[in-house]
Amino acid sequence: MKFSPLVDELIQSLRCLPGVGPKSAQRMAFALLESDRKAGIRLADTLSRAMSDVGHCQKCRTFTEQSLCPICSSSRRGEADTLCVVETPADVLAIESGGHFQGRYFVLQGHLSPLDGIGPEELGLSLLEGQLVGGGISELILATNPTVEGDATAHYIADIARRAGVAVSRIAHGVPVGGELEYVDSTTLALSFNGRLPL
């Protein structure tokens, strides 16, 4: 069934979000139009402001409305000598929620993928190399995803770090806490065995 052109456009617009199919988009559109128009107006206003005002931190490339994000502008963390490289701003939030890392970040906004036209320049690797060569960084922690592209990206960046004389490490991969071995895939299990630690 076709709705009014504007309702159809709203449904199609909502489908641009990851994981939102036609039915989910229709439910969202109807919820906003039927029951909570104030929330819909607030959503539209916030979305409009975010799209025009949110950019990238000049130092780490995460999302921010300022020239520097809160971590890079922090007097305590902005000068930390440990730098963690991640693929997305969501990865920063995941690590921050653990509360264990107190260094700075560098957000690639993706991973190397030559077939998709994503090379070193698209990931800001010249900016990263400048920070490593410029001094002040003693350790680089690579926290890219454990995928073929994530591994290739980590190896590429590790070479840059070594040339700059910066110690480089990669986060461990393996069996999740609370996980049962029978449900762990063979690749993860192999990584766990290869990365085992003495007790």
Curated annotation (Swiss-Prot):
UniProt keyword list: DNA damage, DNA recombination, DNA repair, Metal-binding, Zinc, Zinc-finger
MF GO annotations: DNA binding; zinc ion binding
Toprim domain span: 81-176
InterPro entries in alphabetical order: DNA_Rcmb_RecR, Rcmb_RecR, Rcmb_RecR_Znf, TOPRIM_dom, TOPRIM_RecR
Biological process annotations from GO: DNA recombination; DNA repair
Residues making up the signal peptide according to the UniProt record: none
Zinc-finger ranges (C4-type): 57-72
Sequence similarity: Belongs to the RecR family.
Role this protein plays: May play a role in DNA repair. It seems to be involved in an RecBC-independent recombinational process of DNA repair. It may act with RecF and RecO.
Descriptive protein name: Recombination protein RecR
